[in-house]
């Protein structure tokens, strides 16, 4: 055989690159990354991350969320364990000596043989945009001080960054995930949480002490930046065998959402605006069929979105519609059939889901051509459709989903069974950068990434496999 000339070698390389690029754009990527995992078990209740704050009846499990549609209010929530104590929040702007007071409401609940502490929820309204606020809870020796930033004023070219976490739980891997996110120099200004919080329901009798331990574990983040809550199957806590017949009982007592502000009738589906984004939260485990409250609300909600004001349209849900893992395969199908045509019509930019304990990103696809007789039931590329991202890889006790359907479907652009978190950084009305971070990588490493082009302002092809 003769020697290969340099020109021939260059041509071969070019051809191989073109072939590889073609394969990636049509078949997607299944990562073969080898994971180093801690034990997939929950941390014991005496772990440092669950430590109760010092002092009698000190406020604990502090968390905040957005308190209205526009982003000028927050809801501060906390628990006092021994007694009701004060339901007051003192707050003030940075570099200001003028302090304000807000008073909240307190509730308790019982779940089988568990009785909760005193759960406080206090709305703080009429805040200024783009401002740092300090706030204090408790009295005397048990006062605890925290802070948060309000979002910038709503507008199309305001930069804003979201963190993304799902299915977190309270295992050793959960701790790695939250620590990795908290220490990420590019971490979000708010967290979009796609459901499955404490996994208390995996314990006998849904041991609600695990709701308390999770609240203390996550406080290092939830007390300082708003977490936007989505409900998952592990928030249902429906246990008629022990006399607990009310779904979502612990969640609805412990966590608040601004659902009334957006015209919703339940706290499980609602919408908010934050900077340049319009965020719609849907409930995979509440009724969503035609004529249900959630269906009617969403039908009226999409036309309200003003893309000249909030160009980025983001949807959160728990159960993914496009999932190529064996776990929970096709579970989101009935909801997809009900709502997907609206997602395409209104040009949703991205959908974030959890439930599957792994990571996956889709191409822009839709599957709305099917009817009972035409047999057209295969997803197709659709530049008016959203990218679907499954980020249920927070690290919970149930472990990773490692079994995938083979061959990899064409709608799947990238998938990997690893724990991690993601960052969605909106730059302006046309561009946003997305990156997924494995737990065991350095912060500069993005295990997956994509530049998003806004579907309303810049609807050019941003096929993930070809542009990541």
From Swiss-Prot:
Which note does the record give on the cofactor? Answer: Binds 1 Fe cation per subunit. Binds 1 zinc ion per subunit.
The EC number(s) this enzyme carries: 3.1.3.2
Query: What Gene Ontology cellular-component terms does the record carry?
Result: cytoplasm; extracellular region; plant-type cell wall; plasmodesma
Subunit structure, as described in the record: Homodimer; disulfide-linked.
Q: Which cofactor does it need?
A: Fe cation; Zn(2+)
Record-listed Zn(2+) binding positions: 196, 233, 318, 355
Task: Locate the residues binding Fe cation.
Answer: 167, 196, 199, 357
Task: Please give the Gene Ontology molecular function terms for this protein.
Answer: acid phosphatase activity; metal ion binding
Per the record, a Pfam family?
Answer: Metallophos
Name used for this protein in its record: Purple acid phosphatase 10
Which is a GO BP term held by this UniProt record?
cellular response to phosphate starvation
Q: In which tissues is it expressed?
A: Expressed in roots, stems, leaves, flowers and siliques.
| Catalysed transformations (reactions) | a phosphate monoester + H2O = an alcohol + phosphate
Q: What induces it?
A: By phosphate deprivation, mostly isoform 2.
Superkingdom of this protein's organism: Eukaryota
Organism encoding this protein: Arabidopsis thaliana (Mouse-ear cress)
UniProt keyword list: Cytoplasm, Disulfide bond, Glycoprotein, Hydrolase, Iron, Metal-binding, Secreted, Signal, Zinc
Q: Which family does it belong to?
A: Belongs to the metallophosphoesterase superfamily. Purple acid phosphatase family.
The record's InterPro entries line, in alphabetical order, gives:
Calcineurin-like_PHP_ApaH, Metallo-depent_PP-like, MPP_PAP, PPA-like, Purple_acid_Pase-like_N, Purple_acid_Pase_N, Purple_acid_PPase_C_dom
Residues listed as glycosylation sites in the UniProt record: 95, 113, 175, 306, 428
Enzyme active site:
328
Query: Where, by residue number, does substrate bind?
Result: 233, 355-357
Keyword Transferase attached: no
Q: Give start-end of the signal peptide.
A: 1-25
């Amino acid at each position: 055989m003769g020697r290969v000339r340099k020109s021939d070698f260059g041509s071969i390389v070019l051809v191989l690159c073109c072939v590889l690029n073609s394969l990636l754009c049509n078949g997607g990527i299944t990562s073969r990354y080898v994971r180093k995992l801690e034990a997939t078990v929950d941390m014991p209740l005496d772990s440092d991350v669950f430590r109760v704050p010092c002092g009698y009846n000190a406020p604990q499990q502090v968390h905040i969320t957005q308190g209205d549609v526009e982003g000028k209010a927050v809801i501060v929530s906390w628990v006092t364990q021994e007694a009701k104590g004060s339901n007051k929040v003192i707050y003030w702007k940075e570099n200001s000596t003028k302090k304000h007071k807000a008073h909240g409401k307190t509730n308790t609940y019982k779940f089988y043989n568990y009785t909760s502490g005193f759960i406080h929820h206090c709305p703080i309204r009429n805040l200024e945009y783009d401002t740092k606020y300090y706030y204090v809870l408790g009295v005397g020796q048990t006062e605890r001080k925290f802070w948060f930033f309000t979002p910038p004023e709503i507008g199309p070219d305001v930069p804003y960054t979201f963190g993304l976490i799902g299915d977190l739980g309270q295992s050793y891997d959960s701790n790695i995930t939250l620590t990795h996110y908290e220490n990420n120099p590019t971490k979000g200004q708010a967290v979009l949480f796609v459901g499955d919080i404490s996994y208390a329901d995996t314990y006998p009798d849904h041991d609600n002490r695990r709701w308390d331990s999770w609240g203390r574990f996550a406080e290092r983040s939830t007390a300082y930046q708003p977490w936007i809550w989505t409900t998952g199957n592990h928030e249902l806590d429906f246990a008629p065998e022990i006399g607990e017949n009310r779904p979502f009982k612990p969640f609805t007592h412990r966590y608040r959402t601004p659902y009334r502000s957006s015209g919703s009738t339940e706290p499980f589906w609602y919408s908010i605006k934050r900077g340049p984004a319009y965020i719609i939260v849907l409930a995979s485990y509440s009724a969503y069929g035609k004529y249900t409250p959630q269906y009617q609300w969403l039908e009226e909600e999409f036309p309200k979105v003003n893309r000249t004001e909030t160009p980025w349209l983001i949807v959160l849900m728990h159960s993914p519609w496009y999932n190529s893992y064996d776990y929970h395969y096709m579970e989101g199908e009935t909801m997809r059939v009900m709502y997907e045509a609206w997602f395409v019509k209104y040009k949703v930019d991205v959908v974030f889901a959890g439930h599957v304990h792994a990571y996956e990103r889709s191409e822009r696809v839709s599957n709305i051509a099917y009817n009972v007789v035409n047999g057209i039931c295969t997803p197709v590329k659709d530049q008016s459709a959203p990218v679907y991202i499954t980020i249920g890889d927070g690290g919970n006790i149930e472990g990773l989903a490692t079994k995938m359907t083979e061959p990899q479907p064409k709608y799947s652009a990238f998938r990997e069974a690893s724990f991690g978190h993601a960052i969605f950084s909106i730059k302006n009305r046309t561009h946003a950068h997305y990156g997924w971070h494995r737990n065991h990588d350095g912060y500069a490493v993005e295990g997956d990434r994509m530049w998003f082009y806004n579907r309303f302002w810049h609807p050019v092809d941003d096929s993930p496999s070809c542009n990541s």
